[in-house]
Every structure is written in structure tokens, then in C-alpha cells.
């Protein structure tokens, strides 16, 4: 040991050296790298995320993973309008976000044509998109029961599009008693895009391929839907289906493609 008479300025230092002493090892480091932070995925339960081919839903899924959820994915498609590019893009987005799960998950690709047909025939035109989202929630609830999932996740951002106004979201919420997490609800598009670039989802999300909502949107969407008119459309659709519960069971068994991630 040698006394060099050197001094240390603890208030205005040039380099900070940290020492983390464990039982059998000591770790010495001078820099820290920020990780994704949050809670360990899977520590807070499991969720079903409604995944589209857009920018929002993958980020919503990832943010809820950071709050301790393992996430399974579902996408609703019409085989008449869904292209191979659309299916490929959604699958790749699911694979990307799945990397942040604590275990490998699944993507459920639902052929929603049977229910879409009833919506087209029995809903007021301006309420079609709201009814589509309503029945997606109802079907997602059934899937959650089948796979023992705790909550639903959507990429809704308040006021971003006509079907995401406060009144429209309230109507959709009534479709299921399950908690619907909307982690993007207060973010604007610039913030969402920044997060998409952060996890590498942005370039995938902007590839060609329309989701079902974009193909199903009428020219006159109800921006401020009335609850009584929404209930009327809902009852008309349900009345046109002979046995809704049986239809759901049949669709789960015969109209879903399961992709292991």
C-alpha cells in the first residue's frame, strides 16, 4: 500500500464506479444501460390482446407486458378481404412482441365472416363498426375463458379514430364484464410511433395490409353513438343468430387457426 496523497471529490467527480457485492462475487461497473423496466412478464397474470396489423396494438401489448402480463394474441379477419401479406404481417408482429413474454405464446387467427355477415345485414349502417368491435369483445371473452386469461388488451387511443370516441368506447365496454386495458388511451400518435420504433415494431406495422376494421368501416360512422340505438342494433344481430353460444363454440373449434409463437 502506498499513500499517494490523492483526494476524491465526492460531489463533482469525473467517473462513478459502483461495486455490487454478492455472496461469492463482486461486480464492479462504471456505466448503466437502461432496460425495458417494469415487472417480470407473467408475474401479474395472463391477457388476450386484440392484435391488428397497425402500429397501436403491438405497443399496447408490450406496455402491458411491462406491467407483468404474459400476452396471448388474437386477430379477427375476413378471408374474403384478408391478404397473405396481412396475415404474414400480423404473425410477424405477434412473434416480435412475444419475445417479451416469459414463455412462448399463441396467435389465434379467427375467421369472423359468419358474425360479420349478421352485422352487415342487421345493424344500422353507422353502427356497423361499433357492433363489429362489440362482437370482437364478446368473442374475446369466450376465448379468454377457454384459455384461462385474465384481461383483454386493445390499442385504443381516445379520439384517434371515429370508433374510439368516449361514447363509442363506453358502448364497446358493455359487451363484456372483463377488464379491458387500454394503455395507449392518453397517448398521441407521435408518442405511439416513438414506442413502436423503440421495440422494432414500426417498420413491420407500416407494411401493406389492411386489418378488418379498415375494410369494414362505412362512410358514415356514428361518432357520438346513442346507447339505445346501439342496443337496438345489438339485439337485432343477436336475434338473427339461432344459438349464439353454439355458434361461438363452433367457431372456436372450426374457424380458428392457431399459430405457435
Language model segments and positions:
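S-adenosyl-L-methionine
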Residues: 95-131
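Hydrophobic/small residue at the entry helix of a nucleotide-binding pocket
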Residues: 55-56
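Short, conserved beta-strand edge motifs with alternating hydrophobic and charged residues
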Residues: 74-75, 107-111, 150-156
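General small-molecule cofactor/ligand-binding pocket signal
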Residues: 9, 108-110, 181
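RNA-binding accessory domains that recognize and position tRNA/RNA substrates
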Residues: 1-48, 61-106, 174, 222, ...
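Short hairpin/turn module used for nucleic-acid contact or packing/dimerization
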Residues: 161, 168-261
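Active-site adenylate/phosphate-handling loop in enzymes that bind or generate adenylated species
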Residues: 1-7, 32-44, 116-117, 121-194, ...
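Cofactor-binding loop segments of dinucleotide-utilizing enzymes, especially the Rossmann-like FAD-
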Residues: 52, 76-78, 112
Amino acid at each position: 500500500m502506498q499513500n499517494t496523497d490523492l483526494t476524491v471529490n465526492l460531489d463533482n467527480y469525473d467517473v462513478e464506479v459502483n461495486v455490487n457485492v454478492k455472496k461469492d462475487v463482486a461486480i464492479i461497473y462504471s456505466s448503466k444501460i437502461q432496460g425495458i423496466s417494469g415487472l417480470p412478464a407473467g408475474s401479474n397474470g395472463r391477457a388476450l390482446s386484440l392484435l391488428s396489423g397497425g402500429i397501436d396494438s403491438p405497443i399496447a401489448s408490450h406496455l402491458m407486458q411491462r406491467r407483468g402480463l404474459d400476452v396471448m394474441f388474437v386477430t379477427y379477419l375476413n378471408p374474403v378481404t384478408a391478404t397473405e401479406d396481412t396475415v404474414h404481417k400480423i404473425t410477424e408482429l405477434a412473434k416480435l412482441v412475444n419475445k417479451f413474454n416469459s414463455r412462448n405464446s399463441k396467435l389465434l387467427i379467427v375467421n369472423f365472416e359468419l358474425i360479420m355477415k349478421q352485422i352487415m345485414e342487421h345493424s344500422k349502417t353507422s353502427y356497423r363498426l361499433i357492433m363489429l368491435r362489440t362482437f370482437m369483445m364478446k368473442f374475446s371473452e369466450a376465448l379468454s375463458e377457454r384459455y384461462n386469461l385474465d384481461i383483454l388488451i386493445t390499442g385504443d387511443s381516445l379520439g384517434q379514430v371515429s370508433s374510439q370516441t368516449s361514447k363509442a368506447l363506453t358502448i364497446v365496454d358493455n359487451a363484456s364484464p372483463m377488464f379491458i386495458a387500454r394503455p395507449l388511451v392518453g397517448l398521441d400518435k407521435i408518442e405511439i410511433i416513438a414506442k413502436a420504433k423503440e421495440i422494432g415494431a414500426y417498420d413491420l406495422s407500416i407494411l401493406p395490409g389492411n386489418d378488418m376494421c379498415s375494410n369494414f368501416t362505412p362512410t358514415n360512422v356514428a361518432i357520438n353513438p346513442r346507447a339505445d340505438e346501439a342496443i337496438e342494433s345489438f339485439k337485432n344481430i343477436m336475434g338473427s343468430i339461432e344459438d349464439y353460444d353454439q355458434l361461438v363454440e363452433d367457431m372456436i373449434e372450426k374457424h380458428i387457426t392457431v399459430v405457435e409463437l
